[in-house]
Amino acid sequence: MPRSQNKDNFLDKAFTKMAEGIVKVMPIDSKEKEAYLYYRKGLAAQNDGDYSEALEYYEESLKLEDNQVDRGETLKNMAIIYMSNGDEERALNTYKKALGQNPKQPSCLKNMGLIYEKRGRMAQRNGNQDECDIWFDQAAEVWSKAVRLYPGGYLDIENWLKTTGRGNVDVYL
């Protein structure tokens, strides 16, 4: 393991332990505390590359978590794992669930657009311009929303929207 990654893992584990201690003394009910601890364990496992363990912890967190913003964050992390594992359809469905819990997650929209844009490029390579346009239009739709939520945060996407002519001028800074 590279030295910098080892240091990052140490810091993440130290932060996780510290967060667990803080959560134990916070004046919130035990269900919320337990949901947060499962979430943190899922995040630590995800950072360590243990995706199956991370998904198990995230599932447990979702069973306990009532806060929609927190549920949206957990679902987003699950979708990232599915996307990393190449399960694009499950990733898209999970991103949509995450946005249903918290529609103000530009990274979900960005990642959905990445999947749509990839599919469009594949259709283009296969000579299917109509299918390519459908996928690119879907990418433009979600990316335009992401740029509106996070102006200046996705310059590469803003550039893609401009150069393909699929974005509205009002989305840019």
UniProtKB/Swiss-Prot annotation:
GO biological process: photosynthesis
Protein name, entry field: Photosystem I assembly protein Ycf3
Species classification: Bacteria, Bacillati, Cyanobacteriota, Cyanophyceae, Synechococcales
SMART domains: TPR (SM00028)
Gene: ycf3
PROSITE patterns: TPR, TPR_REGION
Stored PANTHER family: CELLULOSE SYNTHASE OPERON PROTEIN C (PTHR44943), TPR REPEAT-CONTAINING PROTEIN MJ0263 (PTHR44943:SF8)
Membrane topology term: Peripheral membrane protein
SUPFAM superfamilies associated with the record: TPR-like
Principal location listed in the UniProt entry: membrane
